[in-house]
Amino acid sequence: MHPLFDFRKAAVTLAAAALAGSAGTLAIFVLPSLPAAGLSAIPFAVFLSFLIVPVWFVGILVVGYPAWILVHASGLRGWLTATLVGALLAAASSFVFATQIMGMGQPPAAVNGWVNGRQTIRNGAYTEASRSAERATLMLVLVAGVVGGACAGGALWQVACRRELSR
């Protein structure tokens, strides 16, 4: 069987890519903010890790892997080309996903909240400062994680293909 269609290897590669992208995104986003935020960043990091892993796995599985197959089926054999196409499509789908989930989940009406001295929740409604910061943060996290996961998947896939073809 051609290594491109070995779904067992594909599943392992996709899982590794999702975890690599998630870990990379979490490190990029959380580690610089830990000294300034103290322990308050740790619960947010845990929340992000639960959000990131399924988003990257679905993004890579639903968008990245089909893009990889389409690029190879069209005659382009470069793993970098397939990785970039998959990463761009996955980033676009993540952008749509993120804009859809931004309106979900309102806090209770009596809740007020501040982050770094800025009020982000006023009487149970997110303030504009909160919405713009959340959108920018979520876009950065989604795009960085998907691209990181797609690149990790492309590199691992290339290694798997070379080993299979060298046998």
Go through the PLM ranges and name each one.
Residues 1-167:
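Juxtamembrane/disordered regions of integral membrane proteins
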